[in-house]
From Swiss-Prot:
The keyword Repressor does not apply. The J domain is necessary and sufficient to stimulate DnaK ATPase activity. Zinc center 1 plays an important role in the autonomous, DnaK-independent chaperone activity of DnaJ. Zinc center 2 is essential for interaction with DnaK and for DnaJ activity. This is Chaperone protein DnaJ 1. It is found in: Cytoplasm. Its cofactor is Zn(2+). It comes from the Bacteria. Binds 2 Zn(2+) ions per monomer. One of its GO terms (biological process) is protein refolding. CXXCXGXG motif repeats lie at residues 147-154, 164-171, 190-197, 204-211. Participates actively in the response to hyperosmotic and heat shock by preventing the aggregation of stress-denatured proteins and by disaggregating proteins, also in an autonomous, DnaK-independent fashion. Unfolded proteins bind initially to DnaJ; upon interaction with the DnaJ-bound protein, DnaK hydrolyzes its bound ATP, resulting in the formation of a stable complex. GrpE releases ADP from DnaK; ATP binding to DnaK triggers the release of the substrate protein, thus completing the reaction cycle. One of its GO terms (cellular component) is cytoplasm.
């Protein structure tokens, strides 16, 4: 290294005091003998000397004029390098995030035995009618609850947690080692109290000192009308009780809706398929049918059926909409619709009399085999046309 203190620290001659300090930190951390090895001691001394001169305005002015700033102040001599008015502990603080092992330092302190519990997730199976119209159901939930014997304290009746003799309540043990830099202090959680700062000499036999036990409890859950498969209900503070009888987490109940034999759900609409005979489709008819309300014994009888008017000439795939007989809109007013798709059933077995009647009908309508017409695809595939015919 040269004797130019600015060059030693790697700063310009007009560097500010803050720039000089930062440069010294970088150099000192890189060249300190405990980091770079004993061979760097001489270079480290020069860095210390450069910082001592340049951080002092009077010494820096003497050096800038070409004088010897150590002529009156004295140099390092044989006593090793000085601190130059800068605590090396601060350098280590920068590396250890403010938890320096040098000097006294502040520890983490004991951790609390009482902590918030985890959230819990359970699943509830519903029928389609329960999901659509809402229901109140009981549900068994397996979670941790506050120990009924010690009420969360973790200690037997008449016993209390006492200060840990090993760490004196600090929750950590500190070891001190002598080094070239001075005392190096390191801390770790106390092995006796596991960082709590207290020990339970007579733990509760019911919970083994945990302050909580697992149990299966039954809760009543009100399911709002209109929930869908996968929806969740959030219940505050009904989840797992925390260690030490701490506050309970939240409980989430996820809905699983079973399929229905007749109805399917599409958003807020219900869909069903009804088969009618060929004659009814041709002549028109009125079809009474059960609605989803029929699955609920607690509903009025007049809500359980609806009559749908089928117009004459109805074709297979015709869909008729019954307004406001679908799913109640969740957290909104109104209901979706009920869509009824009709399938026209063609008879497969006819006696001779029935065949004669159909022949007479065909003759009256002048229908023959040549009356069949080919539907134009319009660029659509066969499956697309079939799907459209059934309201897809």
């Amino acid at each position: 290294m040269s004797n130019d203190y600015y060059e030693i620290l790697g700063v310009s001659h007009d560097a500010s005091a803050d720039e000089i300090k930062k440069a010294y930190r970088r150099k000192a951390m890189k060249l300190h003998p405990d980091v770079a090895g004993p061979g760097s001691e001489e270079e480290f001394k020069k860095v210390q000397e450069a910082y001592e001169i340049l951080q002092d305005p009077q010494k820096r002015a003497v050096f800038d004029r070409g004088g010897d700033p150590n002529a009156r102040m004295g140099g390092f001599g044989e006593g090793g390098f000085s601190s130059a008015g800068f605590d090396f502990t601060n350098l280590v603080d920068a590396m250890f995030g403010g938890s320096s092992p040098f000097g006294s330092g502040g520890g983490r302190g004991p951790r609390s035995r009482t902590r918030r519990g985890q959230d819990a997730l359970v699943r509830m199976r519903l029928s389609l009618a329960e999901a659509v119209f809402g229901v109140t159901k009981s549900l068994e939930v397996d979670t941790a609850v506050v120990c009924p014997k010690c009420q969360g304290k973790g200690a037997q009746s008449g016993s209390e947690p006492v200060t840990c003799d090993t760490c004196q309540g600090r929750g950590e043990v500190i070891t001190v080692q002598r080094s070239f830099l001075g005392d190096i202090r390191t801390s770790q959680p106390c092995p006796t109290c596991h960082g709590y700062g207290t020990v339970i000499p007579d733990p509760c036999q019911e919970c083994s000192g945990e302050g909580r036990v697992r149990t299966t409890r039954t809760i009543n859950v009100k399911i709002p009308a209109g929930v869908a498969d996968g929806n969740r209900i959030h219940l505050d503070s009904r989840g797992e009780v925390g260690p030490g009888g701490g506050p309970a987490g939240d409980l989430y109940i996820e809905m699983t809706v079973s399929p229905h034999d007749v109805f399917t759900r599409h958003g807020d609409d219900l869909e069903m398929v009804v088969t009618i005979p060929m004659t009814a489709a041709a002549l028109g008819t009125k079809v009474p049918m059960h609605t989803l309300e029929a699955d609920r014994e607690d509903f009025a009888e007049d809500t359980k059926t609806v009559t749908v008017e089928v117009p004459a000439g109805t074709q297979s795939g015709t869909r008729i909409v019954v307004s406001e007989r679908g799913v109640p809109r969740l957290r909104r007013n109104g209901r979706g619709d009920l869509g009824v798709t009709f399938i026209v059933q063609t008879p497969t077995k006819l006696d001779s009399h029935q065949k004669d009647l159909l022949r007479q009908l065909a003759e009256a309508r002048e229908e023959t085999n040549a009356s069949a017409s080919v539907e134009k695809s319009g660029g659509r595939g066969m499956f697309s046309r079939i799907k459209e015919a059934f309201g897809g």
